[in-house]
Amino acid sequence: MARYDVLVVGGGTGNNVAAAAADAGLDTALIEKGPLGGTCLNRGCNPSKMVIQAATAANHVREAERFHVEAAFGGVDFAAVIDDVEATLSPIAEGMAARYREKDHLTLYSDEAVFVDERTVEIGGERVSADRVVVAAGSRPLVPPIEGLDEVDYLTSTDALSR
């Protein structure tokens, strides 16, 4: 069984904890089943701002006449917007993972962690333990309890940014 000083589950804000621990010379395991950067980089803050920017541009074209500008609105290619989001943000997560794989005192596990006791996790059939464990994982969109919402086709941020 691999043993570390610090074990961090979650590569969103948890990656900052893991990097700081490794920089302090502590042998650190960082476990993330998805791309590094967590919700903010991959499914929340950053991609939503890019989608909002596309919507803002579309709205400017639709309202151009108000400003005595001739422009024709031909629609939004949402798939192309999402392609741009992925093309912009995926390299950031991939670059982060590449840097972490080269970082002294840091081991990156790209799989799901399942706790077997309070200081040990199983990752793809391998057990890993540590003296200190940080759990910084599990963010998911909140679907508010709005009457009738279950009767309509709604999207969460994860749904909207997926194909």
Where in the sequence are the language-model features?
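Beta1/beta-strand and adjacent pyrophosphate-binding region of the FAD-binding site
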Residues: 1-11
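Glycine-rich flavin
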Residues: 2-4, 20-26, 31-163
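Glycine-rich Rossmann-fold phosphate-binding loop(s) that bind the pyrophosphate
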Residues: 9-13, 33-34
